[in-house]
C-alpha cells in the first residue's frame, strides 16, 4: 500500500496535500482530477480490503485475571525533555535563519525559515488533532461517517480565502499539468492509502508516535516515490508535461 500510494502521489503531482487540500484552494484543475480519481481508488480499495484475504483471523482467549497497566514516569520525563530540546533547537534555527542568514535575491525572508515554521506548526496540529485524510475518504464508503470529511472541507474553505488574498497581492498559485497522470496518480494514491491504512500525512506523525506499522508504510512510500523518480523521464511528456496547466 505504501509503495502504491507513494508512486501515485508523485505521478499525480502531489498527495492529499498538494493535489487536494492545498491544490484545490489554489484553483488548479489538476487537483480536481486527482481528487475525483482518489475517491474512485478509495472506493475500489474499500471493496478489496473487505475480501476474506485481508480479514485477519482473531482467536479469542478467555481472560483469568486483569493485568494492570504500568506506567514509567522516568521514561515519560525523558521523552518530554527530548521533545522540548528538539523544539528549542528548531526555534533557535528558525530565528538564526531569519535574523542572520543572507536571504536569496528577491526574497525578504529566508524561505527555509518559513518552511520550517509552517512545518512545525502543521505537524503539531495534525498530530494533536489526529487528522487523517485516509479515514476522511475511506469512512464515507466503509462506515458512512463524514465528520472528518466535513472538517477537511471546512479547512479547505478557509484555505481558499487565504490563498485568494495572496493571489490578489501578486503571488502566483501553484498550477500543475492537468493530464492523465493526475487521474492515474489519484486512483493509485486512493487505492494505496486504504490498503496501507494511512496517507502521506498520517504515516509520518504516527510513525514518530511509535506505531511500527507506519514505519513500514513510510519505507514503502519512499520506495514508490523513488520508482517514480527513476522512471519519470519515460512517460513524463505523454502523460503530464505535454498537457496544459489550467488555472481556474
Regions found by a protein language model. Give the residues of each.
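Membrane-interfacial helix-loop segments of redox and metal-homeostasis proteins
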Residues: 1-248
Amino acid at each position: 500500500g505504501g509503495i502504491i500510494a507513494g508512486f501515485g502521489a508523485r505521478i499525480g503531482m502531489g498527495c492529499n496535500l498538494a493535489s487536494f487540500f492545498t491544490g484545490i484552494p489554489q484553483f488548479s484543475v489538476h487537483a480536481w482530477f486527482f481528487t475525483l480519481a482518489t475517491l474512485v481508488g478509495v472506493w475500489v480499495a474499500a471493496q478489496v480490503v473487505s475480501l476474506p484475504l485481508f480479514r485477519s483471523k482473531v482467536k479469542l482467549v478467555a481472560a483469568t485475571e486483569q493485568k494492570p497497566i504500568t506506567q514509567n514516569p522516568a521514561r515519560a520525563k525523558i521523552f518530554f525533555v527530548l521533545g522540548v530540546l528538539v523544539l528549542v533547537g528548531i526555534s533557535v534555527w528558525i530565528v538564526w535563519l531569519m535574523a542572520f542568514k543572507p536571504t536569496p535575491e528577491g526574497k525578504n525572508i529566508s524561505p527555509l525559515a518559513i518552511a520550517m515554521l509552517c512545518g512545525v506548526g502543521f505537524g503539531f496540529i495534525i498530530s494533536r488533532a489526529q487528522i487523517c485524510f485516509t479515514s476522511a475518504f475511506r469512512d464515507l464508503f466503509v462506515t458512512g461517517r463524514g465528520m472528518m470529511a466535513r472538517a477537511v472541507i471546512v479547512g479547505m474553505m478557509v484555505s481558499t480565502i487565504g490563498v485568494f488574498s495572496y493571489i490578489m497581492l501578486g503571488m502566483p498559485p501553484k498550477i500543475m499539468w492537468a493530464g492523465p497522470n493526475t487521474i492515474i496518480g489519484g486512483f493509485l494514491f486512493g487505492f494505496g492509502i486504504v490498503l496501507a491504512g494511512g496517507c502521506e500525512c498520517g504515516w509520518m506523525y504516527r510513525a514518530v508516535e511509535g506505531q511500527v506499522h507506519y514505519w513500514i508504510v513510510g519505507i514503502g512510500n519512499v520506495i514508490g516515490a523513488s520508482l517514480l523518480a527513476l522512471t519519470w523521464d519515460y512517460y513524463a511528456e505523454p502523460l503530464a508535461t505535454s498537457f496544459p496547466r489550467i488555472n481556474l
